[in-house]
Amino acid sequence: MEARSKPQFLAFLILFSVLFSQSLAWPLFGPPSVVRLDDRMPFEGAGDPDQVSLKADSDILQNPLAENGTPYYDVSRNARHADGVFTSDYSRLLGQISAKKYLESLIGKRISSSISEDPVPIKRHSDAVFTDNYTRLRKQMAVKKYLNSILNGKRSSEGDSADFLEELEK
């Protein structure tokens, strides 16, 4: 039993040390930088009044919490983050739209969004379907008419059979 507990204890110790070292590197526990707090960077050659304000700001930098005890959040950083999220989502949407258009052009079924585009492939297909259905209907009606004439005892003459063959060929 002791042989099994030593590797488990060692694994637990390694995991704990990794997590603890990562938590020390976490920015909330360290002092925030001047760039994150004010979006101001001290430039070289700053005058005496700026040095005094920089000393006053250094007290703020030591405490990452505001006076009321809540963490300090930079509004401009949140705005930049929101802009980045919007830009990435918008780019993804544009990519999906362009992929859809490309796929439609490959298939040959472009969706016409304006009157100027000519939906010829779709129209040709619908015309062919209509013509096929209409031809089938005419043949069925000709067969029905011929069978009715035979069943009713009317014999067709030479002229009627020629009309029947013409109707079947149409």
Swiss-Prot record:
Residues 22-79, 156-170 form a propeptide. Glycans are attached at residue 133. InterPro entries: Glucagon_GIP_secretin_VIP, VIP/GHRH-like. One of its GO terms (cellular component) is extracellular region. Keywords: Amidation, Cleavage on pair of basic residues, Glycoprotein, Hormone, Phosphoprotein, Secreted, Signal. GO terms for biological process: adenylate cyclase-activating G protein-coupled receptor signaling pathway; mRNA stabilization; positive regulation of protein catabolic process; prolactin secretion; regulation of protein localization; regulation of signal transduction. The modification Isoleucine amide is found at residue 107. SMART domains: GLUCA. GO terms for molecular function: hormone activity; neuropeptide hormone activity; type 1 vasoactive intestinal polypeptide receptor binding. It comes from the Eukaryota. It is found in: Secreted. The modification Asparagine amide is found at residue 152. Residues 1-21 form the signal peptide. The modification Phosphoserine is found at residue 76. PHM-27 and PHV-42 are two bioactive forms from proteolysis of the same precursor protein, that cause vasodilation. PHM-27 is a potent agonist of the calcitonin receptor CALCR, with similar efficacy as calcitonin. Belongs to the glucagon family. This is VIP peptides. It comes from Mus musculus. The gene is Vip.
